[in-house]
């Protein structure tokens, strides 16, 4: 985002860039409904409106894009902090952090109703919320936005320090350690919960990403060692395609249809083989796309 939005930052006409932003948001949201929202089931009763990682990315991207376009760096930091604090207030004072007692869960149930993932229908036509589905989405959109902003900040650091790789590595690692430390302190009051994507979880996961980014930046950009890492580029250049393929198409069935004879020899490890074969098939498809320069652009 820091790279692609820089040319639109000072342009008073934000119409063209907003059209691109809305297009990306809609496409990612629809892809999310295809992957997990049961859109292809063509059954309105089992349609889930907001239930997938791609939709979380779409919402986070939309929030972060607006912040990037209309705020300078100082205000970007302030607004990102406000997103975390605004999320925290009702989560702390209007509920607890139990699966059914948290504020974010109540918002999802109230707004989405039977269009929420985890709902099951009874024979009499009534429906109920599942006690085993505890992911939250609507209120957690605030922290999704903060997560994308952390990624944008990492991009700004790398863009600004392209002529000083050592400083980039140091900055990424220091921020990563600081975010993790702060998240652990905050977790004493607000637990680190992935399914709720709490503010502490946002900082913790962001800290890990900064550390990983620093490590890879050190190895590849600073030291110039990229041998053995090309497979990451194959995945990274078509990451959304990889995710959709792996979730929508059951390649395990394809693997089982041609390797069922191995089950008698592998025993309990046969399922492990099928899982490996599933990812192998996806990788081979991505490799062909990479070599043919076919990339899914949103």
Task: Give the ranges of each region predicted by the language model.
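Alpha-helical transmembrane segments and their immediate juxtamembrane cytosolic regions
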Residues: 1-298
């Amino acid at each position: 985002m820091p790279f692609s939005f820089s040319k639109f930052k000072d342009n008073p006409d934000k119409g063209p860039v907003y059209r691109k932003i809305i297009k990306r948001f809609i496409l990612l949201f629809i892809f999310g409904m295809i992957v997990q929202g049961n859109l292809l089931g063509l059954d309105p009763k089992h349609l889930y409106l907001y239930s997938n990682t791609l939709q979380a990315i779409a919402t986070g991207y939309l929030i972060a894009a607006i912040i990037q376009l209309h705020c300078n760096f100082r205000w970007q930091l302030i607004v990102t902090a406000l997103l975390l604090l605004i999320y925290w207030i009702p989560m702390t004072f209007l509920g607890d952090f139990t699966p059914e007692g948290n504020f974010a869960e109540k918002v999802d149930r109230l707004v989405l109703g039977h269009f929420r993932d985890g709902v099951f229908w009874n024979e009499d036509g009534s429906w109920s919320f599942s006690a085993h589905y505890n992911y939250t989405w609507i209120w957690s959109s605030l922290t999704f936005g903060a997560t994308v902003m952390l990624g944008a900040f990492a991009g700004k650091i790398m863009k600004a320090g392209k002529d000083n790789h050592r400083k980039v590595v140091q900055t990424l690692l220091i921020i990563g350690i600081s975010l993790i430390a702060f998240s652990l302190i905050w977790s004493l009051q607000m637990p680190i919960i992935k399914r709720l994507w709490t503010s502490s979880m946002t900082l913790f996961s962001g800290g890990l990403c900064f550390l990983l980014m620093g490590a890879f930046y050190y190895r590849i950009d600073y030291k110039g060692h990229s041998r053995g890492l090309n497979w990451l580029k194959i995945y990274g250049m078509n990451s959304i395609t990889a995710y959709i393929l792996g979730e929508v198409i059951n390649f395990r069935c394809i693997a089982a249809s041609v390797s069922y004879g191995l089950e008698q020899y592998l025993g309990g490890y046969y399922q492990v083989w099928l899982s490996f074969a599933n990812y192998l098939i996806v990788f081979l498809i991505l490799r062909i796309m990479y070599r043919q320069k076919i990339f899914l652009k949103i």
